[in-house]
Amino acid sequence: ALPQDNTAVARIDTLVREGLLTRDLATILHGLRKVRNKAVHENYSSVTDSKNFLLMAYGMCEWFMQTYGDWSYTHKDFVMPEENVMIVSVDKEAEEKKEAELAKQAEENAANAPKVARDERKKQANKVANQRPKTEAETRFLIDEQLRMVGWEADTENIRYSKDVRPTKGRKLAIAEYPTNSTVGNRGYADYALFIGEKLVGIIEAKAIHKDIPSVIDYQGKDYPRCIREEDEKYVIGKWGEFKVPFTFATNGRPYLEQYRTKSGIWFLDLRKPDNSPMALHGWMSPDGMEELLAA
């Protein structure tokens, strides 16, 4: 049943509450909703956002097809439309008529489709959501949202080193593409460096969904904290053997799932003790939580 408050927010939240929509997919729908509102009410436009959200919308459509349509459908790579500078005359009346015909046909197909038990549908929805491929842009979008929810300022497109964002007193920043002297991975750029004020407290490495995340911790996750540049030494709050950052994280943006143990969740390693092992977290540490751990 539709919620009493029949807004987009309420509908999305109802689907999550009833187990028909994962948190990640809900985050994407909320992102689409917000950027749409921004475009309509603030005249906002961004080619980068448009391309990223178009890819995510395509991924949502594939999930919908595999959940409510053809369960045998297999993923097909999205092809970005070429830029078209031609002005095309559109017959609006014909377009609306065609849309109405397609909607009617879809309703008839739905009415004649085999009935699927609710629990079976939920199982399929979650299975498809957890197995679907994610683009790097989607992974970054999800991580940004997750970090913001626990109190970090995160925005991969705007809060990044190349846009002159630097550690600042009074701010809790997740600065994207932060340079180090490392020679491994992304040319020495950490996906995010976490700063509480002017204190460098963590490094985050974001990876593709098929990667084994604990191995990322042992590779880039350890190398970046070793290779902090001389000009960034002023942000270092201590040294633990060869490490100049206390905490390191790796993730692919996927929520922790026991059946995909090493390929899901947020993996964390406290570098302050050499015998510590990587462990899976169910959510990001907040700045306050990190400060409490540092003080322990």
Model features per residue range: what roles?
Residues G69-A296:
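ATP-dependent helicase/translocase motor core
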Residues D5, V47-S50, E136:
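Alpha-helix N-cap/helix-initiation sites
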Residues A1-Q4, L20, C61, M65, ...:
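Short alpha-helix boundary/capping elements
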Residues L2-V35:
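Short, charged amphipathic alpha-helical segments flanked by flexible coils
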Residues L20-D24, H41-Y44, T48, T180, ...:
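Short coil/turn segments at secondary-structure boundaries
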Residues R23-K76:
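Charge-enriched, short contiguous segments at helix-coil
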Residues A8-R11, L32, F53, T139, ...:
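Alpha-helical structural motif
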